[in-house]
């Protein structure tokens, strides 16, 4: 069974971008970064994939948090997940996000709304 964890809050602090989720049903100590990202065109969200022994977990990063993603990407700040007192580095986050952004840019296959949202946040000066 796969689950989605929605990022509730984002904070840039200490040279890192922190993504906060509440009430994760699986302890972060049992989770491993998959080092891969997807996009949910309908929800206008990026999804970083985590895995456990028996399932995948998707850390969903909705559009309201994208400006902070862009700032962290530009500053090359590592991205970390926090749930309560537990933390986990989301390895290869910038490489994966950059790859997705370049694929989405100018690509109608992702849907006009997502393509425009990515253009507005990540490529407009």
UniProtKB/Swiss-Prot annotation:
The protein's name in its UniProt record: UPF0738 protein GK0828
Pfam hit, one: UPF0738
Family in the record: Belongs to the UPF0738 family.
Family matches, as InterPro entries: UPF0738
